[in-house]
Amino acid sequence: LLLNSIVNASISPENLYITWGVFVISTSLSYLYSAQSVILTADQNVYLVKLITGLTRSLAYILQIFLMICGVSFWIVCAIELLSNVIQLILFNKLTLKKYPQLVKLDITDTINKENIISVKTKIKREIKYTFVHKIAGVVVFNTDYLIISVFLGITVITSFSSYMMLIQALAFLISAIASPLGAYIGAKLYSDSKEKVIRIISLYNSLFFMLGIFCAYMFYISSSTFVSLWMGKEIVLSQQLVLLLSVNCFVLIARISFDVAKVGLGYMSDIELPLLEAIINIIVSLVLVHYLGLNGIVIGTIVSNIIVVMILKPVFLYKNALKSDNAFIIHELIRSWFFISIFLLSIFFITRAKVIVSNEWLDFFIQVCMSSITPLLLLIMIYSVFYSNVRKFMFVMFKKNYREN
């Protein structure tokens, strides 16, 4: 009954509930190999985790798209998702047994005493509870928009909205995959270097991901509508005003990666009130504004929760509670981040007027995207290099390293 009320469309109960059940089982299977992925990540082998998950998911997506184009039954398409997780489970089990055969014969009671076992179990249970709250709140935050759109605006609006969101999520997924090893690096530095050096590293990462988020958000704003038009047709294209709002969410989704990576590296998951607050703000503001602004109001609800929680409270909690930084440093970090964003927006609007790309051919579109990316990229590098010595030193080291290799 709940699914029928949420999905405002004429779909038979069999198709609705069986499809839902398949995806629930598929998601549940992913938890069966979570322990193996944790072991590999902790042992600095996160690239193996990303290799397995990346390859299987990519192949599954390609096969699903091909089958849908060929008009194959949707049940088979759903089965591919299930098969993908089964293959990942098999691969993770085989890889873990091959790399760590001692785990099969290991008796943990021989290595640590009972008091330590109880202490470790208590800590693990606490962290699992915190992580569970984070995951549940994350599911609510990232799926609230779709539910509210389905209930109040109809399922047809989701097609246009999801087309743009898929581009944003694809960017975030790619960048997250690249950034995931940084968590293990921060964790290693926490035990080998001083707290001040760890703070400088995290501050550098925040600046770099802010740069990346600003760049991706700008490129999304000027190119996403043309991409969607060429891909799915002009009737799917959203207004440029709404695309601007989605660009803000694109920026936040990428910029927040640095905070999430730092939290994993520091082992800090105690801020369970933040994701709950983010979900509550998102739901309340979206439910209120959808009656006045429609789809724009729902997106604004997400922006409000993102800015308050993700861009302000999350870094404050991270620096203050996990790194024990003083208030002056935290305020300085926040002001500097937003100062760079303001300088970039004023400069790019003055130079390019944020002209939206218009094209009727794929080749011409990609050429325009490449050409339009040069100015904002150079501008970002110049702004951060001039105003932030940490980024300037990093770029100098990278340039010097590449020069020596060549």
Predicted regions and their residues:
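Short runs within selected transmembrane alpha-helices of multi-pass transporters and secretion channels
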Residues: V22-T41, V49-Q64, V77-N93, H134, ...
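Interfacial/gating helices of multi-pass transporter permease domains
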Residues: F74-A79, S119-E127, I149-Q169, K197-R200, ...
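Membrane-proximal transmembrane or re-entrant/amphipathic helices at the cytosolic face
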Residues: K105-I108, N321-D326, H332, I348-N406
